[in-house]
């Protein structure tokens, strides 16, 4: 029995699944995190606000602070779990009372870099970072790569690893792929909450393919600051705008 208990303790400490609890993340955010995870020994789980009493079962509790509305009792539950040793970080808290973090400054900066530059690669490596550096597992660990800056103010296509700073570069790529159609209608796609580099983009890809199959040249734009400049240069025949 003692041997079995020792083996179980060793497994739990060095090899067991890393569990990351998510509090107040929107569905599309959760989907991006989950779909980016490629490690069998890392799991995400959403934590409803009425179940904050079980934060202690997670190896990291990651909360999204924007729009987080909790009662004093719920906030006390989060603080109590942090005091008891559960790693907790409420990211992007807009209410100072919800600015709760039990991570050291370096670990907090690491998590912030991954999630602040949200893309599939960073989300995947954030999960690995949690297992390696916060959960401190020794087995079934894939070393985390450093966070990379997420592409912004760019055009993009079906290959999520590619982005294009100029319309000319994007059209050159389409021609090289045999996709560009001379004198075909131009359709621009802008807006939407889905970051095309977050790993959760099946709906965007489906739209791009459908429009291309219909004989159109498609220009998906991921930009806030230069959106109008891109549209002026593209000169689209129609614009599909995802307001939300």
Which role fits each region the language model picked out?
Residues 1-244:
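An N-terminal assembly and electron-transfer interface module characteristic of large anaerobic redox
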